[in-house]
Each structure stands twice: as C-alpha cells, then as structure tokens.
Amino acid sequence: MDGQEHAEVPNSMVEDDQSVVAAEAIAELANSTGEPNPEEGEEQSVEDELIAKAQKLMEDITSVANNPNPNILHALSQLLESQESLFLEENGHFSNARGSHNSGKLCILIRENDEFFELISSTFLSENSYSTAVKAASARLLMNCSLTWMYPHVFDDAVTENFKNWVMEEAVKFPGEDSAKKEASDFEMLKTYSTGLLALSLASRGQIVEDVLTSGLSAKLMHYLRVRVLKEPSTSRIHTTETKHVSLKTKEEGRSRVRKIVDTVEGDHVLETDSGREMGQTDVQPDGEFEIDGRDVFNVSGVVDCKIKPGDDNSVRDDPSRHRLNRSKSRGRGRVHEGAPDTEVLLASPRLGRLLVRDRDLSKISDGRNAEDVTVCLGKMKSGIMEIEREDNDECFQGCIIGTKNITDLVKRAVGAAETEARAAHAPDDAAKAAGDAAAELVKTAALEEFKSSGSEEAAVSAATRAAITVIDAAEVSRNPTCVTSDQTTDVSEVSLPDIESLAQLQEKYCIQCLEILGEYVEVLGPVLHEKGVDVCIVLLERTSQLDDRSTVSPLLPDVMKLICALAAHRKFAAMFVERRGILKLLAVPRVSETFYGLSSCLYTIGSLQGIMERVCALPLVVIHQVVKLAIELLDCSQDQARKNSALFFAAAFVFRAILDAFDAQDSLQKLLAILKDAASVRTGANTDRSAPEVMTSSEKQMAFHTCFALRQYFRAHLLLLVDSIRPSRISRGGVPSSMKPNIRAAYKPLDISNEAVDAIFLQLQKDRRLGPTFVKAQWPAVNNFLASSGHVTMLELCQTPPVDRYLHDLLQYAFGVLHIVTSIPDGRKAIAHATLSNNRAGIAVILDAANISNSIVDPEIIQPALNVLINLVCPPPSLSNKPPLAQNHQPVPGQATTRPSTDVAVGTQSTGNAPQTPVAPASSGLVGDRRIFLGAGTGSAGLAAKLEQVYRQAREAVRGNDGIKILLKLLQPRIYVNPPATPDCLRALACRVLLGLARDDTIAQILTKLEVGKSLSELIRDSGGQSSGTDQGRWQAELAQVALELIGIVTNSGHATTLTASDAATPTLRRIERAAIAAATPITYDSKELLLLIHEHLQASGLGDTASALLKEAQLTPLPSSASPSSIAYSTTQEMSTPLAQEQWPSGRANSGFFTSKPKVCAHDEDPNSRSNAALSAKKKHLASSTLEMPTPVAQQQWPSGRANCGFCPSIPKINARDEDPSSRGNAAPSAKKKQLTFSPSFSSQSRKQSFSHDALPQSTQRINCCSNSDPALADTSETAAELVLKNDLDADAQFKTPISFPRKRKLSELRDSSVPGKRIDLGERRNSTFADGSGLQTPASALDANQSGSSRLGQMTPASQLRLPSDPQPSNPERLSLDSLVVQYLKHQHRQCLAPITTLPPVSLLHPHVCPEPKRLLEAPLNMTGRLGTRELQSFYSGVHGNRRDRQFVFSRFKSWRSFRDETALFTCIALLGGTNHIAVGSHAGEIKIFEASSGSMLESVSGHQAPVTLVQPYVSRDTQLLLSSSSSDVQLWDASSITGGPRHSFDGCKAAKFSNSGLQFAALSCEASRKDVLLYDVQTCSPCQKLTDTVTSSRSNPYSLVHFSPCDTLILWNGVLWDRRIPEKVRRFDQFTDYGGGGFHPSRNEVIINSEIWDMRTFKLLRSVPSLDQTAITFNSRGDVIYAMLRRNIEDVMSAVHTRRVKHPLFAAFRTLDAINYSDIATIPVDRCLLDFATEPTDSFLGLITMEDQEDMFSSARMYEIGRRRPTDDDSDPDDDDETEDEDEDDEEEDDLDRILGLAGDNSDSGDDDLSSEDNEDSVSDFDEEADILIDGDFMEELIEGENEDDGNGEDEDDDDDGEMQDFMSSGEEDDYRDNIRSS
C-alpha cells in the first residue's frame, strides 16, 4: 500500500520547529476549552482567538507542505472536536445550526482556505510521499470539517480510490476486531476515517458507487457489523469479488465496466490466496507493526512478507495539475450534514480514552544498527511501489563480494535510498531503476578501489559504508529541505488521539452510512444476507432504541433506520425482516423528532411492496392497528418528509381491507382532511400579496398532493368493497343462493383499484339495472363522514388551484377523482350541487372552470376527470331509467304495442354469447338514462326516485347558470390539438354525455335546438376517422358517435339513437330533418286500381300476356293508353335493344327520380336463373311468414289502410349491369337496400348490439335486430324484416365484404327514416355524393352508386341474386316479409319528402304521375326589382306587395359611398359620434382630446383636452335645445355642452367609465372602475348626482371587458354582461346564458327581444329564439327606425392596440362592417372598408354613417370618415350610377343574378372596388324567406336553408315567404306590423 512511512535521516531543525508549533497549538487548545466567559465582549474575543489559532495552524502546515507534522493536523482536529462537543451539549445531537456556532465557523474557515483545503483533501491523501500519520490526520480533519458541508465534496478520483483501497486493506483490521489491542495505530485511524470519507463520496453517487459495488466492500463492512453487533468471532472473509494481486491495467478495466445485476451474489467470492498472511505478521509485531522508539507506528508487513501491494503504483503521480481542487465539484447534489446532523455525534469527537504519544527526537535511538535496519526496511518499503521488485540475483547486486566480505546489504541500502529519492521526485520507473543502478555502482566502485589500493577488506567495507551513507544522506536532504519557521522555544506538548473503542464506534457508524447508500443495489443483497444482515439490523434497532439517562435516543438510531429502509427495498430482506418480528421492533422505537423520518421511510418502503404488506396484514389485528396508529401519528408530526412518507404509505396500503378497517376504526379520515383543509386555506392566499400558486410552498404542495392521492385510493377501495357487498348474488349449482355464504374478501389480500377496475365498476353501475338501484339505496358511511366534514368543499377549494406545476396539476386530478366517486351517490351529488366556497364561488363553477378551454389551451388530464364529475351530476345512469331497456333507444309512438315479439326473447338470449345462462337483468343500451328515475317497487323507492330527480334537476340548473353550456360547446370545436390522438374524441364524447344529461331538461333541450347543436355534432361525426375498434381512439369514436346521435335525436325531436338520427347527423340543416319528419307523419293513400294497372304492365313487359289479360279481366281494369305501354327493354332477352331512357314509358319511369334512380341495363342470359331465385326466395318468405305471423296479409286487397307504416324508403337501387338486369331486380332492390339500412342501425345504438352486428365473430343467429311491433304488425314490417335478416346472414357469410362502419368525411349523408317505428330504416333518396358502409361492409346507398355519381361500388357490378347467393345459402327462419303495399307506401313517402313544402294532409296519391305538393304562388309579393316595386307602389298597391319594405331595406342598406374624411396628423382617433341636426361630428383621441369637425367642409372647429387617458366612448344626445356630449375614458366620464366644448365640461364623474345615455336622456349609466366590483352606476343628467347602483353579486369569471351598458327602449330595464335589471326592483331579473366569451348585445327596438352576442332571447318567456352566427363577436347599433342592424367587430375599447391583435386581424370583419335585417336577422350585406375599423356611429336621419378607421397600423394613424347610405361609388365612366337611367336595367339584372349568392351567404364579399367603393350590388334580396317558411314548420328557429347541389332544392320560388301570418304570430317582435303601418303612413 501507499500508506507506508518514509525511511528518513532526521533533520533536527525541522523536527524542533514542528514540535514547538504543535506544542503551542495544543497548549492554547487546552486553554480554549475552559468555561466560556458570560460577557459578550469576552465571547467575541474567544471566538476571534480560536479563529486566529486555527489560522496559525493552517499556515504552519502550508509552510512545510512537503514534510508536514501530523500533530499539527491532529491539534486542529482537536480544536474542532472540542467546539463540536460544546455545540452538542448546548443544542443536542440533531440540531442543524452549526453555521452560527464556533464549530461551524472554524469549519468554514478551513473550507475557504483553498491552499490548505487542497492539501488535506487531495495532496496529503493522494501523494505516496506522505506518511500514514499525515494521511490519518488529514482524514480525521476532513471528517470534522464535513459536519458543516452544505453539499458533499467531490474528491479526486485518486483520493476516492485510496479511500476504497485503505478500507479494503486486509493487512489491517478494523478497530475493535482484535480485542487484545488497546491502542489504535495510524493505519487503523486512517482506515476508520477513510470509511467515513468513502460514505461522503458515495453520497454524490457516480462511478465510485459502481467501483465499490464490484469490489466486495459491502461484504467487508457487513462482516464488521456482524462481528461488532452480534459479538460473533471474526473469521476469514471471502466476500470479495476480485483478487488482490492484479495488475494496474486489470483494475482500470474493471473500473470502467458497468456492473451487472444478478439474482444472487453469494457465489461470486474468491478465496484470497494469502489468507494466512496475518498470522505470519505477528512474528514481527502484532498486526505487522514496528514502533520506532515509541514515536510512530509503521506497518512493515509488506517488508516482512516481501510482497508488493498492487495498489502502490505510480499512477497517482501522472500530472500534478490532476490533484488541484476543482471548486465546481464541491457544490454537489444536496445538503448532507446540515439537514441530517444526526450523522455526526459524540463519536466524531471522543473525549475519553485518548492515547497520548510523545514526540521524541530521532537522535535518542540507542542502537544505530537497528536504526540502519529500519532505514533499510523503510527504503525497501519505498522501493516497494515498484511494479517489478529487484531480486537478489539482480544485476546491480552482482560483484558485491570483496575478498571474503559481502557488501550486498550496503548496496541494497544505497539502491533503495536512490530509488526512493527518484520516486519522490515523480521520476518514472526507468529513471528510478537507473538511479538505483548508479548508486549500486558507486558503492561497489568505492569498495573495489579501496580494496585494490590498500588490499584491506575492512577498509573496502568502510569505503562502501561511506559511499552508501553519502547516497542515503543525499536522498534525505532532497526529501526534507530545511524550512525554518518563526522562533519557537516552547517545549513539545502532547496531542490527543482517539482510542481503539472510539474508533470502533466511529467505524460502526461509518459502515452503516456506507451500507445505507449501497443497500438499495441488488449486488449488496447477497453479502448482507450471508452476513446475517437482518439479525444485525434488528439488534441494532433494538440496541439504539433504548433511551439513555437524559431520555434521548442514540445518535446512531436514524442511520440504522435508514439502513433498514434501504435494505427493505429488496423483497427478500423485507420478508425476513417481517418474519423476524421487525415490525414490532419498529413499533417500539421512540417516536421523537429524530426518528420520525426513519420510521416513515420504513413504513413507506414496506407498504409499497404488496407481497410484504400481505405478510404484515396477516399479523394480529392489534399489530395492524398499531401500525396504522403509527402512520397516523406521523401524519401529525412536525417533519414534512415524514408526513409525506406516511401519506404515501396509506396510499399504497389502502388496497388492503385490514388497513382500511383499522384506519376507519380510529376515525382517521379527519386527519387526511385536516391536512388538505390546511393546504386549501393556504392556497386561498389570505392576507398575502402573492398569487395562489406562490402562497403554497413546495413542501406544502407535495404534502397536499400525496394526501389527496391517498384519499382517492381510500375511496376507490371503499367503492370496490361496497359494490362487492351489494352485488346481486348468483344462483349456485345446487340452487342455493350464494348469499347464504357471503364471499368476503380476505383482509390481507390486495384489492384491484386501478383505473381500469374503477372504470369497470362505474360502467357496471351505469348498466346493471339490479346493481344500480341497490347502490343508490345503500348506505356508505365513509362518504357520509366525508360530506359531514365538508370534505367536498375542501376538494373544490383545491380544484381552484391553477395547475402551474406538476404537483398542483396532479393534485387536481386526484381531487376530481375523489369527487367522481363521491358524486356517484345522491347525497354527494346534492352536496356538490349546493356547495359554496370560501370566496363565494359555486362548486359547479369550479368544476366547469377546470373543464374550460382557456386561450386554446387543452389539458385533457384535468378536463377529463372534471367532465366525469359533471356526468355524475347531471346524467342519470341508464340503470335507473324509467323506460324499459329496449324502449330506451326508441321513441314511443301512440298506439305502439308495449309487448315485445316473441323473437326478442330468443335474440336476447342468443346474443349473450358465452355469458352464463342465468337470469340477468337486461341492461339499458343508452349512455344516459331518462329524466324519470325508476328504482323498483320497494318501499320508499318512489320518494327516493323523486329526490334523485330533484337533485339532477338542480344540478342541471347550476351547470346552466354557470355558463356550462358555453364551456361544453367549446369542447365540441372541430379542431382541438392535443395528444394522444384519442384525446379529442374522448373529451368530445364526455362533453356530449354531459349535454345529453342537460338535454333531459326541456328548457336546455330547446336551447340546444336553437343553437343547432345537431349540425355541429354531424360535423364531428363526419370528421372522425374510421379507427379500429380495438384501439382507444376507435373506442372513443364509437362512443362519440353513439352519444352524439342520441343527443341529435333529442334536439331534433326525432327520437333516440336510431338510424333516423344517423341521417339527421348527416343532414346539413334542420330544415331537411323537419321536412322528412313531416313526410314520415303524413298518411299515404293511393288508388289500388292504379297499382293493378302497373302490375298489368309489368306482366306484359315480362312476356306473361295471358296472366296480364286474366288480371285485366278479373279486376275489370281499363288498360292504359298505348303511349303509356312500356317498352320491353327492361326485360328483353336480346341484348341489342338499347332504347334511350327518355323513350321508356313504363310506369315506374313516369315519376321523376322515381322508383329506380339508375339507368336499367339488361342481360339476357341472367333472366331465368334470377327469376327462379326470386321465386324460391318468395316461396320461402311466404312460408316463414305464414308460420310465424298471427295475422296474415290478405292476398287481394283493394284499399290498403293509409299510414300503416311510418317508414322511410330507399327509392333507388344500385347500378345494375346490363347483363344482370332481370325481373328479379325489382324484387331484390328493396330487400337489398333494406338489409343494408338495418345493418347500419346497431352501430349507433347500444354497445352490445353494435358488437353483435359488426363482424361475423358471433353466430349468425345472434345477428338479429330487435324490433318492437307496430300498431299493426301484420301489415307493417314483419315481412320486410325477414327478408332483411335473410340477406344479412348471407352477406355475413361472405368475408370479402366485412369492413368496419365508417363515416365519410365532409360529405353529405342521406336521410334515414323509420320503416316500422322502432327499427328505423335508412332513407337514401336525398343522398347524392356519399356512401355508407353497413355492418357487413357493403355500401348501402344506391344513389351513391348511380352511374353519374359513383362507380366504385362492388355491388353495382353484379345482380342482387348473384351478389347475395340466395339460391345456394340456407335461409334462417324469419317471421316478417316485405309486402307490395309497404314498397309502394315507402316510394310515395319518398316522393312526398322531396316536396319543397310537404303538407300533412294529402288526397290519394296517383301512382301514374309524379307527386308534387302544391306550392305557394306568391302573387302578392313585391317584385324583386326596385323599379318594379316603385311601379307597383304607384299603380297597384300602396305598399308595393308583401315584403316590399324589407326588400327596400335590403336595397338601401347594401349600398354605401364614402363622402368625406377627417384627419389630424397629430392625433390618433379612437371613437366618433355624429351630432344630429348640427352638421358636426365629435371624435375622441388616444391623447384624451375631444375634437369637433364640420361635416360639410371637413375642418376642425374645436379641440379640448378633457381626459388624462385615451377617450373610449363619445355619445351625443339632444336635450331640448341643448346638444349634450358624454365622453368616457378608462378612469372618468365628462359631460359636455357640444355647442361649446372649449368652455370645459359641465361635470366630471370620477371612478366610472364606459358611460351611455338612456333613451330619454335623463340618466346615463356607467361602469365602476374597480376591477374587483361589478357595479352599474346610474347618474341623473340634470343634477349630475348618482341615483342608483346595480351590483352583480355572482362571483364568476364570465365578465369581459367588451360589455357595455344598454337601456331598454322604455328605460326601465338595463342590460350588462348578460344580466338584466329592472330599475324598479333591487334584485336582478334574469341572468341570460352566454354561449361564447363575447358578452354584450342590446335590446331590440321592438321591446320584446334582447340580443346577447349572437343569441336572440324572448323577453316575455326568456327562451332562446334563435342564434345568429353573423352577430358573433360583434358590437351592434340599430338605425333610427330600428329595422336595420349595423354590426362591427367587437374590441377592447380601453386598449387601442387590441384592435390589431393577430387573431382579430384574421376575422372577416376586421376591415368591414355588416348590415342585417332587424326583423328576421338575415344578412343584408358585408361592406369592406379595407382598413381596421375602430368605431361606428349613426345619425337620426339614416343618411350618413361615421367610422373611425386605422389608416396605418405601424404608425398608429387613424382618421374619421362619413359615408352616404343608399348610394354607390361612381365608376370610371359614370359619376353616379344611381342617377343614370342607362345602367338601371343592368343593375337590376345584376341584382337578380346575385340572389343565389346572397342565399348562400356570399353577400358583401365583392370588394373589387377601391377604398371608397362600399357598394354591395348583390344584396337586394334576403335569405329571410327561408326563415319565414321554416317558422311554421319548426317554431321559427331556422336561419337559412343551404342549397345542397344538383338534383336537390333548386331554390326557384322556395326562397319566397309564404307564412307572414305565422311569423307575426310566433315573433311579435319581428316588426312585420311596423312594415305595414309604415307603408300605410307613406301612402
């Protein structure tokens, strides 16, 4: 080893100086340890004296750095230890306040002396030239200094390697291992302190840990603890993983290897080859030590054994710069000893048992010969660092015989001294060997020369001796240069060194510290178990847990518990620890502040291992209760980390019923809630200026996070146990209910409370109609206690925390997880719905805020659990539904039979597949139950159901009142960019479920209908891509489709989740849905003789002339005219016949878009087989029908009942190939289409039905469709369903057509309609451009396969018979079949649906001619042309016809011409007002100025500075003869006399803003400037005093800076921010729902409507009338008559820069304004101004407009402009086209040509003109005609009907209004009467 001493020739001067210094330091140290002076001044002087002494000692060391005296280092260590002892006496062993004590100050002083610290931490420990005593003293001093290190010091690699080698040194035992020794050697001291320093190095992790793990050190340390603790005799240790005698290269390679984790390491030990060496060492001295005159102890075992230590290489002498202290390394990972002062205790500074060793002069050696021998030994030790030892037969030792004398010893001494000198100078091995050779040659040469000259052998030996002494002296001189210090005359004193027992105690502690760091690694487990580590830990725990005389625990106890915690991470160790009653030992540990962390760490480590916790839970109940009690006490302790560990223990242990029961038995829930309540109270930030996230410290956040997680686990476990306890028992095999033997979960078995398991429980509670009602009625004490303690309020308080960091983010998730479980019971829902937080916020508002998308930021991990809570609050589960399971998905029809067909039972039982054949309550197929709750017929069920309904109703009202609809609609936005891809569909599906629950309320359903939610949902369904059902995305898409269709069925009044709603979702407008609904409800009748005539034609065309004649004769029919006789092209046997379709006159071709939509093509050779196939099919269907139906359909029936089947029908068939067309095609078209329709339905109903119809994984018998019977089942759909199912099973057998159901993207889908009532069919008549894939993969809509539109269908390439393989496949039994009557009725219904205005009462419909409902002629309407209207007004009617005024408005207010501009180069205009009747305009500027301009000349008349802030609003009002002007800024309001503003304002109003006059001008309203208050202040204009204050007391986040105050026309009502006040009563009247973040709006001049952003509300009923998308985000102004609305893009008036915000620039109205008809809210025009629009103003005569536009956004320059209304910009060749007669006709033609563009919403987009071209020539007509036509149909809530493309509503005449009377009845505020009155007055 490199810890050997030098061989040195004494230098008396150096020794004396160092001895004097050490003696003086020790003497002063003894004086400094006396009693402290109580006076402050003397204490300061003592402190200064100590620092001076320490400084002096350091200087003494640094001055002789090459040859330091270890006693000085020991003196400095003694100084630190004495001060540490004083600190411990004053503060105890666990204080961390050393920094302010003398002990800490001395350590800091040493640490900050870079030169000295470099010596003791690197140079002395890494250089081989320093003695063991110096290294031991340095290590001792470093350990004393480490007490105050904030971070672990990072030692050099060479130093850490030496630490490891010294600890691993086998030649030296650990202190205390040899009981015979009483004194500690330097090497033992070095080994002990190296162990401590190694523990410090391991704390910084890194490569040193890898090296130590592979070195077998852990086994050595554990063995020592075993010997010390268990008092077992020391034996040879074999736990080393490497041989000691290895080369340097091997060691370096081993260091770089990464350790491998192995299962066992017990066999990886190599027996050391020289294990008997220790016995041989005792021949020299015990443990191989020499004492030289009692001064120093040197280990010379290497000399005696003639063995070279492998670690004593020259690798540490590579580069001196390597040993420089790297200051950056000393700032490590964390605080080591300040935070855990228990690691250094009295053991670090033992005060007893010191060994006193006197320094003696080397000259007192009595025997020079012995001294020479020792010198030789030392020299040999110095040379022992060579890798290759010089052998006795070495060349340099040859020729040492002089005569008879042998001078080999002298030569060896000289060689050793020379090589030692060379190596001390860091010379390489070759140079050292050369030096040795030279010294040998010198000695031999001197002897030979003397012998030759004198011939005397004695003289030759003397000469050789002198030469050898010369070499040795030279080496000593070079090694020990003379360093004379200051004069010191004091005698040498004695130094205090730790005795053997003190070192043994320190060694024990350092071993524990090392193992506590290494214990978590698997490599340590084997050695620990081999050395009885479990017993050692238990004994240590028991021994250190004993209290001493001062009732304090052992300082070693925290380290022992840390060691147990580290080793308990291994299951093997933990299991043995529990088996050997280690838990009881832990429970016996004193519970004081010093042990809290260790106890909590052990509990958490054991609790996190479920296998170990099973053993713990199997212990006696008393022990389990004590464990839980201990964890609860730790929750209340003062240490944060211990509290966190305890919370984590509970979170991991709550999966065991034993822990759960013990926890509840001690009423411990209050402890968890108390922690969370404290965190919630801190989170509110009371009495602090910091924000909520900053109020909570990091530790508080972590504690709240862990506690909330534990609470969620607690409720999850309770939920699982409760459901298990109430789960309906199944019948055992013996017929005895299993409830007779309750299956109680074992208390020691873990519960599965994972996310998947909890989701499965909630799904079961939702679906199971037995378990659901039982769960509602069950008592849940845990939740009741939680609610009684206001735990739900605490959770909501925590949910208000913004998720700004990870802990708060996860805290919200767990809090919502708790609320999700709590709201599953009625009491929890009621408590949450009525909860009010400390800041007066509603609990529902907090949940909605968490689910809100703010600033396009989507956090699905927060939104999803929040939506789950909302679902529990507003959505009754289907298991509590009042409706039967099957009726859940189908809207009942009057007269429908309530009993299910007998086939339903068979289908229901077969569809269960492998389910147990036990009676199971049928589950509801929907996702949300009905409004009515049904809990069975038990006692009290009705009352409880009523209470549940009331709670759900209150929750819905609370969600609506807190803008819940707006938040949920945001989640349905088509573009939500979040990851993973399934997340948007998940959030949308959950949001739809919440909306579906809200829609159980009729009022909310009506609102959703008006908001056209169905249209948004249809877009979502079409956008969702087809994903595999096995993925999360596919699952969420399927659920989204299901719940969206169910919601559409409610908001469109078209039933629940049926195929009809699929059609509704695919339809772009509600108008089409209503039209289909009217047609479906219309009874259809027809003349049966016309049908017989068609059959007669069909028979003739088929070549059955005799049969046709017989029919003609028997039915007494008159044949159709010959012109109507059909050509036989459809059924010809010759392929050459190709008569055009226009010439074909067969009956079905008479109807335009009739029975077949595609062009028939024939093929001769396919006629007969298909005819036979259809004949067989018909016979089989007839047989099946006769065997199952009780009421067979009559064969001959002259008059079929009308309206027998309210069913839709597909009138078109796939394109048939010419060679495939035959008579069977007519028979197969309907069943083929119907089959495909039915297979679409299950995918949008229940999950079970969707699975049974998706693929052929189930038997064909399970793939049936349950259909409730119609009022007349014999005549309805029984035959249809049979054929459908026959064909479906055939198709399912063909795997090539099995593809998943998918929606086409962004394409229009066909309408679907019910063919019987429950089993709705797909009506594909109106589909043009899309296809649908049914459950078997076939594309269903025949219209999509039309030759002109689609050619991709495989079905269209073959005949139905060959496609479906009817002849060859067996047909299953089917009780229903198609009838000719149903086919005809469906065909006629389809024709009726195509009518533009279908009516509900029809005469018998002709089969021979196309059916078209009569349309209004609109003869009384005013002409579209303006000239025509003027002429009509003069000649025919005083009002020029119906809608004359409306079309005049559209004509006038679509034309605007720039008239004049007003600029001021020095001002930025912000607002404008037109002063009526004065020809003046007033503008406000950003500088706070008010400027008056003359309108006619554009010159500025007056300018005055009235505000300190930018002017935001100016509003004029004429009061008698005075023109008043009201100006506002962000801080005050000024009232001016507009006739002379230079005289100053009439009055100033501070503390208010955004003022607006009332309509009477007697008052004005303003808003309070205080951001925290929501007050509307009313002032009297005459007295200028406040007259009223209206306050919005609801604390919500709905307020926005855009809202202004609005007065009603009669000034009695006030509207602001969606809140309506009546000035005559103190409270608010109404809070309107807001569906966007843009508040504002205003009162309609008709007084019956109020506008909130884009929604129109009825003032009389407070119902939503309609939604006008054109008004979204706009600020509106009415013209003077109140029949036209001007809309400009809303902005924050207090910030002019907000006008040019990036998002605002992209809006279409950024540089434009819009005009709308205020009667029906239809768009008139969108007028571009090509500049950013800031403000807008009107004047009473409706002749001019005033605008403020920003001319230059970069320079922020704006101007005011005035526009003429009703005039257009002159063109290049015509100055005024409105006055030019030559262009009038052309203008009118343009207007008529652009009518369609206006209907399509394209009005106002023509901006080809220049900056002043504000005309809109294509906006003379309005889209309102559609609206008024729809008013009669669906309550007047439709805004417009979009033209859908070719072959659809062409709009000719459809846009005209035919229901003005209905409109006036439904909307009294629409003002149509005003039009008539105005016309009358004008006449």
Curated annotation (Swiss-Prot):
Outcome following mutation: residue 1622 to A: Abolishes the DDB1A interaction
Keywords associated with the record: Nucleus, Phosphoprotein, Repeat, Ubl conjugation pathway, WD repeat
Start-end of each WD repeat: 1464-1503, 1506-1546, 1548-1586, 1587-1626, 1633-1671
Skewed-composition ranges (Low complexity): 1238-1251
Subcellular location: Nucleus
UniProt motif DWD box 2: location: 1655-1662
Motif window: DWD box 1: 1619-1626
GO cellular component terms given for this protein: Cul4-RING E3 ubiquitin ligase complex; nucleus
Modification type Phosphoserine: residues: 349
Main location: nucleus
Family annotation (InterPro entries): LisH (IPR006594), VPRBP/DCAF1 (IPR033270), WD40/YVTN_repeat-like_dom_sf (IPR015943), WD40_repeat_dom_sf (IPR036322)
Listed Pfam families: LisH (PF08513)
UniProt-annotated stretches for the region Disordered: 1-47, 309-340, 882-924, 1157-1202, 1214-1260, 1310-1377, 1763-1883
Positions with biased composition (Acidic residues): 37-47, 1773-1796, 1808-1864
Observed phenotype of the null mutant: Embryonic development is arrested at the globular stage.
Tissue: Ubiquitous but predominantly expressed in the inflorescence and roots.
Xref: PROSITE patterns: LISH, WD_REPEATS_REGION
Domain notes: The DWD boxes are required for interaction with DDB1A.
Functional summary from the UniProt entry: Component of the CUL4-RBX1-DDB1-DCAF1 E3 ubiquitin-protein ligase complex, DCAF1 may function as the substrate recognition module within this complex. Appears to be required for plant embryogenesis and to affect several other developmental processes including leaf, shoot, and flower development.
Protein family per UniProt: Belongs to the VPRBP/DCAF1 family.
Name recorded for this polypeptide: DDB1- and CUL4-associated factor homolog 1
